[in-house]
């Protein structure tokens, strides 16, 4: 196990357990740091809490008294707890540093750490980079907002291994010294404003991914995104751009037929399994990152000719009875469904609907021109039907749920057509999670084989 090195704190408050708080408390206790755990929901009946108490943690459960800050010199905050929380605000007033669990990686390993962030595409890009390195026989472990908690991975990282981390703005706001050997900034648009308070604060949190980098590190960035280009001006790292719109002498780019890294042709677009312009951007970022970290062209091509997407994110399910099936259940908002529709150019049957958050769907209308039929379901079925009528879609059917929508869609399609589940809505009117909705979609498909 790797130990905390040059860790200057003696008595740490872990605020909020869940996965990241539990992992942080474990690492701190194993390194003989005094730990107090404060969680409003956990109880002494919880086996995890009992284990941490046995290891020596002091427990303050069920409430958040200000007194938990007394004698503490560091707060490790669960990413889900906002900075306007009364404990966090008081800690900052007292000058006590507040970090997220991922910052502990700085004290646990000197191995290269690759960090990926952005408003969209993080999981797909992180997965692509990890797979490209693995197929190129580069030892790598994935962590962060995807996979295993970062401190758990860093604690066991070997001297020949690299670490790849997906990072949210919540996590990045709580880092200070963690240095990424390669940082990836995919895109920036308004998101999580309820948490950060403003777009400027959100961008500032995202930019923490490169604030500790120096000229020996790499910053992979989207040269087509004006917000990104403005944000990285102060970065000290060696900047490596990617673009889906123009050639680049010093980065990853594409034309109508091929993807390139600098002047090197990597792969024909027709050979790539993933679809969609947004996925081409993710792939370009992954290629640049992988090449800089030892990936071979052979390894990169192996991944791109077989990788069908992260589950529920415009995932290619397969060809069933001649129909091409895509599961984009993660599309819980209109923007995501617009991007999914833009990935196809003809003969799409769209399955959409879900929780009604008060949205109208006029924004979708320009993206429905190649949709031959819609199957709508859930609370928003009526609103989506109105959008379909406005787009002159010839056939619009209403289904009871996703499973029923699959049956209806097959009756409306011919061989070579595409069936796309991209709901444009959250799932909570009928399903617990978007994952459950996607799984029900796939199960219904398999029953038709």
Swiss-Prot record:
Location in the cell: Cytoplasm
Superkingdom per UniProt: Bacteria
Enzyme class: ligase
Keyword terms, alphabetized: ATP-binding, Cell cycle, Cell division, Cell shape, Cell wall biogenesis/degradation, Cytoplasm, Ligase, Nucleotide-binding, Peptidoglycan synthesis
Binding residue positions for ATP: 118-124
Entry-linked InterPro entries: Mur-like_cat_sf, Mur_ligase_C, Mur_ligase_C_dom_sf, Mur_ligase_cen, MurD
Disulfide cysteine pairs (residue numbers): none
GO biological process: cell division; cell wall organization; peptidoglycan biosynthetic process; regulation of cell shape
GO molecular-function term, one example from the UniProt record: UDP-N-acetylmuramoylalanine-D-glutamate ligase activity
Main location: cytoplasm
Reaction it catalyzes: UDP-N-acetyl-alpha-D-muramoyl-L-alanine + D-glutamate + ATP = UDP-N-acetyl-alpha-D-muramoyl-L-alanyl-D-glutamate + ADP + phosphate + H(+)
EC number(s) from the headed UniProt entry: 6.3.2.9
Keyword Iron-sulfur: no
Metabolic or biological pathway: Cell wall biogenesis; peptidoglycan biosynthesis
GO terms under cellular component: cytoplasm
NCBIfam families cross-referenced by the UniProt entry: murD
The protein's role, per its UniProt record: Cell wall formation. Catalyzes the addition of glutamate to the nucleotide precursor UDP-N-acetylmuramoyl-L-alanine (UMA).
Family: Belongs to the MurCDEF family.
Name listed for the protein in its UniProt record: UDP-N-acetylmuramoylalanine--D-glutamate ligase
Organism: Oceanobacillus iheyensis (strain DSM 14371 / CIP 107618 / JCM 11309 / KCTC 3954 / HTE831)
Gene: murD
């Amino acid at each position: 196990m790797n130990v905390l090195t040059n860790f200057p704190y003696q008595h740490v408050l872990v605020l909020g357990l869940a996965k990241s708080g539990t992992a942080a408390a474990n690492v701190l206790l194993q390194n003989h740091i005094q730990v107090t755990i404060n969680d409003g929901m956990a109880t002494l009946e919880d086996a995890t809490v009992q284990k941490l108490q046995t290891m020596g943690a002091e427990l303050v459960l069920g409430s958040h008294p200000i007194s938990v800050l007394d004698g503490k010199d560091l707060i490790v905050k669960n990413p889900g707890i906002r900075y306007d929380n009364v404990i966090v605000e008081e800690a900052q007033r007292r000058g006590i540093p507040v970090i997220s669990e991922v910052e502990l990686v700085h004290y646990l390993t000197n191995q290269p750490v690759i960090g990926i962030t952005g408003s969209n595409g993080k999981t797909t890009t992180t997965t692509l980079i990890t797979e490209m390195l693995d197929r190129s026989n580069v030892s790598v472990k994935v962590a962060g907002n995807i996979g295993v908690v970062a401190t758990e991975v860093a604690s066991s990282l070997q001297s020949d291994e690299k670490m790849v981390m997906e990072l949210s703005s919540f996590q990045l706001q709580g880092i200070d010294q963690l240095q990424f050997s390669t940082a990836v900034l995919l895109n920036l648009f308004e998101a999580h404003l309820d948490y950060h308070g403003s777009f400027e604060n959100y961008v500032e949190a995202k930019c923490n991914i490169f604030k500790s980098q120096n000229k020996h590190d790499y910053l992979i960035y989207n040269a087509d995104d004006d917000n990104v280009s403005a944000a990285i001006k102060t970065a000290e790292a060696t900047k490596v751009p990617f673009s889906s719109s123009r050639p680049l002498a010093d980065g990853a780019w594409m034309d109508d037929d091929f993807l390139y890294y600098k002047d090197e042709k990597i792969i024909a677009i027709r050979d790539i399994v993933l679809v969609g312009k947004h996925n081409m951007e993710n792939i370009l970022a992954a290629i640049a990152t992988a090449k800089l970290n030892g990936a071979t062209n052979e390894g990169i091509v192996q991944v791109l000719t077989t990788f069908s997407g992260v589950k529920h994110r415009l995932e290619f399910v397969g060809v069933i009875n001649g129909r091409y099936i895509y599961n984009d259940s993660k599309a819980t908002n209109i923007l995501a469904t617009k991007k999914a529709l833009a990935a196809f150019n003809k003969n799409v049957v769209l399955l959409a609907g879900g929780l009604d958050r008060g949205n109208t769907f006029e924004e979708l209308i320009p993206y429905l021109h190649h949709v031959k039929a819609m199957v709508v379901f859930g609370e928003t079925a009526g609103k989506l039907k109105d959008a379909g009528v406005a787009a002159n879609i010839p056939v619009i059917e209403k289904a009871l749920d996703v499973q029923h929508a699959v049956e209806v869609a097959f009756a409306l399609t011919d061989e070579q057509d595409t069936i796309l589940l991209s709901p444009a809505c959250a799932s909570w009117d009928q399903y617990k999670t978007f994952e459950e909705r996607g799984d029900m979609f796939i199960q219904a498909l398999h029953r038709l084989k």
